[in-house]
Every structure is written in structure tokens, then in C-alpha cells.
A protein has these predicted regions:
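Signature of extracytoplasmic/envelope-associated structural regions
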Residues: 1-295
Length: 295
């Protein structure tokens, strides 16, 4: 009897540096497409040939995305490291029926999701060189923590030495802007007869990083100092976690770092004001500015 692939049965593994990390996800998707080029076949002698021929010999880069909880334990910190450093890894998606491999994957976007009364989470999206089915899971499996703890965040934001209160929503997002080096040769095109012999991208390079986000605040009578304003040299820090200080803090932290921001009013049923910010300084180590702090 045939076996179906169900998303609810999926197990996700990241393999980096020879180690295998199992990541519990709440959702995942992935795909890869091939490039198709058409060419005319109509001639003076075959005017009825109005449908063009097709050439398929190369693939686009694969895409993937998944969501994961930002737990207190350190089981998922490999994701933070791969995001900050834009390092390649292999991503495996295992079902009851099959194993799918995304080879030479890189994270292009990591969104740190911070909402009141909801556990911290991270949304990841990225690209990969090649997607294959029927793969074999590799790497040395690392042990997992015995506990699995969520964090309902306490939010602490300071902008230009002033504390922002009455926060409705916060977002932090790191983008890795990459470019794939295509692998296209005459010999490769001639030898491409099916998907396995198609030409795939050969490598990627990092062009730039963008660290930005948003802060949505209830608009009150005593917090209007930055309403409809902007600043290109603001100092911003954000902490969303268990509310502890120092080495006991668990959760997301950003800054203090130099940023630009614009502020705008949102006139809904309850008036809000939103800060759209972007980091403008270039730290020696991004890991000292943006942190997912765990046990």
C-alpha cells in the first residue's frame, strides 16, 4: 500500500559541521523549480507549427521556510548561528515515507516574533542549491535537553535613553542578501538529459545584511515626543524575554545599537504609533548586538 507524506509527521534536521540537530517546527514548506526556455519551430515549410519547442537543462535555487519556537533551552541556537553568519548547511525533512534534502542551504531571512501573551518564536526562510528526494540523513545526532520551555515575553525597549511603554507589537528581522553563482556551460547543457543531470547553481556570495524591525505602541497623551518624527542617529535597545537581568536573562535582545527610524500614526479604533527602524552601524561581531539567549 502506498504511503502518503503528511506535514504533521515531519521531522526537520539541520546538519552543520558534521553534527545533526533536530528542530521542532510548527510549519515548513520547500520547493525547487526548473528553468524552461521556448524556441520557435515554425518554418516557411511548416507554417502550422505554432507551438514552440522547449529546452530544460538548469534549475533555479531551491526555497524553504519554517517556523520554530524560541525555547529557553539551547537546542536551537544553531539556527541563530547560521543566521548571523550566513553559513551554509544541509536541511533534511523526514516523513514516514521519504527523506528530502536541501543541499547547501543558507538562511536569507530570520524574523524574531515578539507578541504579548504569546511565546517567543522565530520565522526562518532561505535558499538552497539543490533539492533531492530519497536522501539519506547524515551527521552525528546530538542529544536534546530533557525539558522544553516556552517564554511569554516581558518587553523592555529604550530609544534615545527613553523607555517606551504600552507596547503592542515588536518585530526584529535580519536579512542576508545573497547572490547565487549560476553553473551554465556548453558541456553541461549538452549532457543534461533529466533532473539529475541538470545544471544547478554552484555557490553563493553574501552581498549585504539588513537588520531592521518595527515597534508598535499605543498612542497616549504622554508618549508623543517622537510622533510623526524621524532620526538617523538614534540609540535603540530591545529586550523580550523572561524579565530577568544579567546572565539570568532568557529571550531575544538587540542593541544598544545606532539606528535610523521613522515614526507614523495609525488611526484605528485605538490610535497607535509605529516606529520602523534599521541598524546603521557596523559592529565587529553581529553576535554582540543581536542575541537569542538560552540556558
Amino acid at each position: 500500500m502506498s504511503t502518503y507524506n503528511f506535514k504533521k509527521e515531519v521531522k526537520v534536521y539541520v546538519v552543520s559541521g558534521g553534527n545533526q540537530y533536530q528542530i521542532d517546527v510548527s510549519d515548513i514548506s520547500f520547493s525547487q523549480t526548473f528553468k524552461e526556455t521556448s524556441y520557435p519551430v515554425k518554418t516557411l515549410h511548416t507554417l502550422s507549427n505554432v507551438f514552440e519547442g522547449s529546452v530544460i537543462n538548469s534549475a533555479n535555487n531551491a526555497d524553504f521556510e519554517f517556523s520554530m519556537p524560541a525555547i529557553v533551552e539551547a537546542d536551537y541556537t544553531i539556527i541563530e548561528s547560521l543566521l548571523l553568519q550566513a553559513e551554509s548547511f544541509d536541511l533534511f525533512v523526514k516523513t514516514e515515507a521519504d527523506v528530502f534534502k536541501l543541499e547547501t542551504a543558507v538562511i536569507t531571512n530570520g524574523s524574531f516574533v515578539i507578541e504579548r501573551s504569546r511565546p517567543l518564536s522565530i520565522n526562518i526562510s532561505g535558499e538552497a542549491l539543490k533539492l533531492t528526494r530519497g536522501a539519506t540523513l547524515t551527521g552525528t545526532a546530538l542529544s536534546r535537553s530533557a525539558t522544553f520551555s516556552f517564554t511569554i515575553p516581558t518587553i523592555d525597549i529604550t530609544l534615545n535613553s527613553s523607555s517606551l511603554s504600552n507596547i503592542f507589537r515588536v518585530g526584529i528581522e535580519l536579512q542576508n542578501d545573497i547572490s547565487w553563482t549560476p553553473y551554465k556551460t556548453v558541456n553541461g547543457a549538452l549532457s543534461s538529459t533529466n533532473a539529475s543531470t541538470s545544471m544547478y547553481p554552484s555557490s553563493f556570495s553574501l552581498d549585504k545584511k539588513i537588520l531592521s524591525g518595527s515597534i508598535t505602541q499605543y498612542l497616549l497623551s504622554d508618549n508623543t515626543s517622537s510622533t510623526q518624527d524621524w532620526d538617523t542617529d538614534a540609540t535603540l535597545s530591545i529586550k523580550a524575554g523572561n524579565g530577568a537581568s544579567g546572565s539570568n536573562f532568557r529571550g531575544f535582545s538587540f542593541g544598544p545599537a545606532t539606528c535610523s527610524f521613522t515614526n507614523r500614526i495609525n488611526a484605528g479604533e485605538v490610535f497607535l504609533q509605529g516606529y520602523d527602524w534599521r541598524m546603521t552601524e557596523n559592529p565587529t561581531s553581529l553576535a554582540t548586538i543581536l542575541k537569542y539567549e538560552t540556558d
